[in-house]
Amino acid sequence: MAATQYYGTGRRKTSTARVFAKVGSGNIIVNKRPLDVYFGRETARMVVRQPLELVEMTEKLDIYVTVKGGGITGQAGAIRHGITRALMELDESLRPTLRAAGFVTRDARQVERKKVGLRKARRRPQFSKR
């Protein structure tokens, strides 16, 4: 591995992303596939690109990602978090900008567990008065 490589771990819901960034031409590879192939949804692709567009490094860095667990939205959020951490490792002066956009904070929301006697986490069975 090259010495000019920057690493960041990102997490969201049940997804974990390992992000490696190095100086390049703007390629983003997710699980050995291009970003456009891996994510079918345009919104997921936008979420992944957000931190790079914010600091105007879309064409300056090559991003290589391995991501596990969760669904499309969770994985996209995890990759965004990982890219943000890699950018901060690259240049610490980017931290205030990324923090203001809300990319540095780990979104701690998790799925609430299903409770006994209920249909879902909070949905109760239908109540019949008579």
From Swiss-Prot:
Family matches, as Pfam families: Ribosomal_S9 (PF00380)
Q: Does the keyword Ribosomal protein apply?
A: yes
| GO BP of this protein | translation
For this UniProt record, the keywords arranged alphabetically read as follows:
Ribonucleoprotein, Ribosomal protein
Q: Identify the GO cellular component terms for this protein.
A: cytosolic small ribosomal subunit
Q: Can you provide one Gene Ontology molecular function annotated for this UniProt record? A: RNA binding
- Which family does the entry's similarity section mention? Belongs to the universal ribosomal protein uS9 family.
Which NCBIfam families does this UniProt record tie to the protein? PRK00132.1 (NF001099)
Q: What is this protein's record name?
A: Small ribosomal subunit protein uS9
Organism of derivation: Shewanella amazonensis (strain ATCC BAA-1098 / SB2B)
